[in-house]
Amino acid sequence: GEATQHQILKTNIRPRKVTRIFISHTHGDHIFGLPGFLSSRSFQGDGGPLTIYGPAGIEQFVQTSLKVSRTRVSYPIKYVVLKEDGLIFENNLFAVYTARLDHRVPSFGFRVVEKPRPGELLMDKVAEYNVPNGPLLGQLKAGKTITLSDGQKLDGRDFLGKERPGRVVTIIYDTRPTENIGKLADHADVLVHESTFNGDEEKMAHRYFHSTCLDAARIARDRHVRKLYLTHISARYTGKAGKELEHEARKIFKHTRLANDLDSFEITLRG
């Protein structure tokens, strides 16, 4: 969004630590802050390569902005153009999926899925083998095979409880209600959903390819989401009017909050 490089200064996030950026669509309020952020990242020293995921046109926008402003970045930028629904990134910690939404320009939602966590270490079972505290216990907890002082080998996987599912965060920006939102939001721990209008403005929301707070709440309810955060609120809803959107959505889905810049929320593991 706009002024990203200014807001990020108020957090403990360092631009050079950011290695991937996901852009939903190319409307100005979602990309005008990108050139400034890229420049700030360069000023802070070499942060290494950066990958930008976004719809067609995002590379042209960035390169033109940097060229016209004669801004030189000190690191390579790779562009991944979003075209098809599905997996777009994966490492050993999490995976990111995308699906096309319904907006005036190509727009995409994102589902971030954390990899499953190892189960809890079964200490009663560990005690039977007199495993000492220290590195060996840590390796066992990580599911690795260890060798005791008497030569006996223990497979860490035999000492762990049931694997715990990772957390899921779904981010939905500019769109009208569409089936793909449900697919991305299904059983998410957190759903961040655009809420440009209140429930009384359903026709206007449809005309301008946006959603209401009630649209977001219905998705959260029907797709068994744990928590819903409303964002992308129209400027007409300031102060108490903004809180009214939250109150309205809670009538359908009680675990709803209005998101503000710099808010911080903990996402707990299930179970």
PLM region descriptions:
Residues 2-53, 81:
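Active-site metal-binding motif and surrounding structural segment of the metallo-beta-lactamase
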Residues 8, 34-37, 62-65, 181, ...:
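Hydrophobic packing residues within well-ordered alpha-helices of enzyme cores
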Residues 19-26, 54-55, 170-175, 192-194, ...:
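Active-site neighborhood of phospho(di)ester-bond hydrolases with catalytic His/Asp-centered motifs
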Residues 46-83, 236:
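Active-site neighborhood of divalent metal-dependent phosphoester bond hydrolases
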Residues 77-79, 96, 256-258:
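Generic structural signal for residues in well-ordered beta-strands
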Residues 85, 178-271:
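Binuclear metal-ion centers of metallo-dependent hydrolases, dominated by the metallo-beta-lactamase
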Residues 93-171, 175-184, 190-192:
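Active-site-proximal loop/helix segment associated with metal-binding centers of metalloenzymes
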